[in-house]
């Protein structure tokens, strides 16, 4: 069932919010209220949108931002690249609009924005938000500048510090008062970057660059403070890989300890389990190879080639986002389909069986869970 709620704005048509009903009854004692999903929208279309699912009402809301902020011109902007909740605020990184939108995480109403050029991903630490940035324009350029990480005060929403890192930085994690940043160098093709920058948080300076692999992208930490880093390769002769970084006994510095011989497009870690999907494009064959796998982070071994166990992965055209419910273990996978029309969000139980699916905005990509009040 789909419900509609129309909105209005002077001299501009507001696309109405649509509601679908999903029967996914939560545990009454759960700490999770729901989740937000940001749809990237095709570059240049200004169609970044925000969806919200509430487990307790069963309502899935498409284009939630427009309903809650009818007077905001151009809505969220162009290409939503990341999303996260810290305290009472929801942060949406809007890459090609060069800003981070900040909303009330309970109501979805706009609180402000932080202007950051070509912003990519956001992480949080001790009252601050940290945003990776390509710094330069959205443009393939062999002379593209080095990127940076911006520090934002989460109370004032002002940029407080900035540090230069490698070329075209992507995801980040913080371990023991050090930030690790995956540098891609994607704008400087074929001269990709191959390093992880290390930032000492106390004085916010880059203190090291760790050689890992070319064209780095994803970077996640596990419960043992190991780092899992993905390389996209060069899409031709140098294949994508996943690397594990850990500290040698008696040393404080991270080093590459393991190389896993397969590609990873995106991943999420829950407990000792790393779920990933891989969409590997080959320029020679002009085709994708898609896999859904599980890695045991303790043994660093691939334990499954397909976490979807009922055959319904055949319904997915292009996996584009992944998340795991922190309590139930339900696995959420988004499908970008053809990149220019509505996508689909799939929910699988922890055993890999499809529970439900729902239509989303264009290019559904990034998910963050909202806790119930009193459970933050």
Regions found by a protein language model. Give the residues of each.
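C-terminal motif of bacterial Sec signal peptides marking the signal peptidase cleavage site
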Residues: 4-7
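Predominantly soluble domains enriched in secretory-pathway, periplasmic, or organellar proteins
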Residues: 9-376
């Amino acid at each position: 069932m789909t419900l509609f709620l129309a909105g209005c704005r002077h001299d501009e048509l507001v696309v109405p919010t649509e509601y679908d009903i999903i029967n996914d009854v939560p545990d009454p004692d759960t700490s999770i209220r729901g989740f937000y999903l940001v749809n990237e929208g095709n570059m240049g279309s200004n169609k970044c949108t925000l969806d919200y699912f509430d487990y307790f009402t069963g309502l899935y809301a498409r284009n939630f931002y427009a309903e809650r902020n009818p007077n905001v011109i151009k809505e969220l902007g162009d290409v939503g690249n990341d999303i996260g909740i810290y305290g009472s605020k929801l942060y949406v990184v809007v890459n090609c609009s060069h800003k981070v939108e900040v909303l009330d995480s309970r109501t979805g109403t706009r609180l402000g924005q932080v202007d950051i050029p070509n912003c990519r991903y956001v992480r949080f630490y001790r009252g601050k938000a940290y945003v990776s940035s390509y710094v330069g324009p959205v443009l393939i350029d062999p002379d593209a500048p080095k990127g940076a990480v911006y520090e934002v005060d989460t109370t004032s929403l002002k940029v407080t510090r900035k540090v230069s890192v490698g070329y075209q930085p992507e995801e980040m994690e913080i371990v023991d008062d050090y930030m690790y940043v995956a540098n891609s160098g994607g704008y400087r093709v074929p001269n990709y970057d191959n390093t992880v920058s290390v930032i000492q948080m106390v004085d916010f300076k880059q203190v090291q660059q760790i050689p890992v692999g070319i064209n780095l992208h994803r970077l996640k930490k596990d419960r043992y403070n190991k780092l899992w880093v993905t390389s996209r390769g060069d899409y031709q002769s140098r294949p994508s890989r996943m690397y594990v970084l850990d500290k040698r006994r008696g040393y404080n510095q991270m080093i590459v300890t393991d190389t896993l011989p397969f590609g990873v497009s995106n991943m999420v870690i829950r407990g000792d389990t790393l779920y990933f999907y891989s969409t590997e494009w080959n320029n020679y064959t002009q085709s994708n190879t898609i896999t859904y796998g599980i890695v045991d982070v303790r043994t660093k071994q691939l334990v499954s080639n397909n976490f979807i166990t009922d055959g319904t992965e055949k319904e997915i055209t292009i996996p584009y986002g992944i998340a795991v419910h922190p309590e139930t273990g339900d696995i959420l996978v988004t499908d970008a389909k053809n990149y220019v029309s509505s996508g689909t969000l799939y929910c699988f139980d922890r055993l890999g069986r499809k529970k439900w699916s729902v239509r989303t905005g264009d290019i559904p990509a990034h998910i963050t869970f909202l806790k119930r009040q009193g459970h933050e």
